[in-house]
UniProtKB/Swiss-Prot annotation:
Coiled coil: 56-138
Taxonomy, superkingdom: Eukaryota
Homology family: Belongs to the CCDC169 family.
Ranges annotated as biased composition (Polar residues): 155-166, 185-195
Pfam families: DUF4600
Organism: Mus musculus
UniProt KW Chloroplast keyword: no
Keyword Coiled coil in annotation: yes
Sorted UniProt keywords: Coiled coil
Residue segments, region Disordered: 154-214
Protein name: Coiled-coil domain-containing protein 169
Amino acid sequence: MGEGHGDTFEGVSTDRLKLELLEEIHMKDVVQLSTLEIRHKIAELEANLNGDLAGSEWKTRYETQLELNDQLEKQIVSLKEKMEKMRGNPSDRLSSIRVYEKMPVESLNVLLKQLEKEKRSLESQVKEYAFRLEQESKAYHRTNNERRSYIAEMTQVSGSNQVSKRQQMDPLPRMKESPVKTGRHNSMNQKTTNAKKGPVKKVPRSNHLPKLNP
């Protein structure tokens, strides 16, 4: 390591090092926020795909979110490459820092404000995506609950219709009467008829034998 002189280290001022550190922190925050957003959305999409509801609306949302995830992943890769370059060869890092050394303080302040503005913009986008995810999740659960309610109602109505049809198509079976039961039934009817007519008159029997002619 070379000797330090003044407020510099390896020919780099502490202000320049602070600016580099701020930029690295900014990139790290962006990567973490983007990764969190992707993981959260993947979990949401997996839950939607594993659910019972598979309509065209959710398919469209899924395809749209895949495109958004692809863009976020490209941004993450780009930011990681920049971070690797800055963490790689020290000479390259110093050369990139020397670029800032040649810039006036006013330009550095403008750059710093621009980085802070980009950070706030990215944070705002993440909040917006989180809000959209929450709204879509509520809409999904509401639609799913309505679907289950409709299915339960349809099942109940279908069961009532089946019971009604079964009652109309299946009349009560009639018992066939056997001949013995029929005879007994006729005998009972005859007794009932005689009872209505009154007591039956008995014919007196003669105890005398007929006389024989000699």
